[in-house]
Regions:
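Amphipathic, interaction-prone secondary-structure segments
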Residues: 33-79
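Long terminal segments
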Residues: 1-39, 93-141
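A short, polar/proline- and glycine-enriched secondary-structure boundary/capping micro-motif
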Residues: 62-65, 89-98
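Short, solvent-exposed aromatic-acidic interface loops
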Residues: 82-90
């Protein structure tokens, strides 16, 4: 596989990642009907909407209260998931921005320094996703 094909595959992987919105709030809210779930709350902070679910988990006669915090942007894209057990602090489990940055940084390693190739690659990226790539493609040149 040549470098160009490898780059296109990486770009397509990033676009596919961007297209997936993640688990949606309405899917999570139905969990309240399960006996383990004790609380579900939602709130807004700046441009993010948070959905917080609390449930109990029993393992070998030890019960823990687990709280999951899902953060969404206004386009209903899941941005991050954090978890806390009992009274501990939240620990990030998943972060869209960090994953996307890692994928793009991996792409940059393979990008040629040739402006013509970069311009050709830019034409292959759908318009909706050009903002995701634009600053990184400038850096590569």
């Amino acid at each position: 596989m040549n470098n160009y094909t490898h780059i296109i595959k990486k770009i397509n992987k990033i676009i596919a990642f961007c297209m997936v919105k993640g688990v949606q709030p309405e899917e999570l809210i139905t969990a309240i009907f399960e006996k383990e779930y004790t609380k579900i709350e939602t709130y807004k902070e700046d441009n993010l909407i948070f959905l917080v679910l609390t449930f109990s988990d029993t393992y070998e006669n030890d019960t823990s209260n687990i709280t999951m915090k899902y953060a969404y942007n206004r386009k209903k894209e899941l941005m991050s998931i954090s978890q806390k057990i009992n009274s501990s602090n939240y620990k990030e489990q998943w972060n869209r921005k960090k994953i996307l940055e890692a994928m793009i940084n991996e792409l940059i390693i393979h990008l040629p320094k040739d402006n013509r190739v970069i311009e050709q690659l830019k034409t292959l990226i759908p318009d909706d996703y050009k903002p995701v790539f634009s600053s990184y493609l400038k850096i590569a040149c």
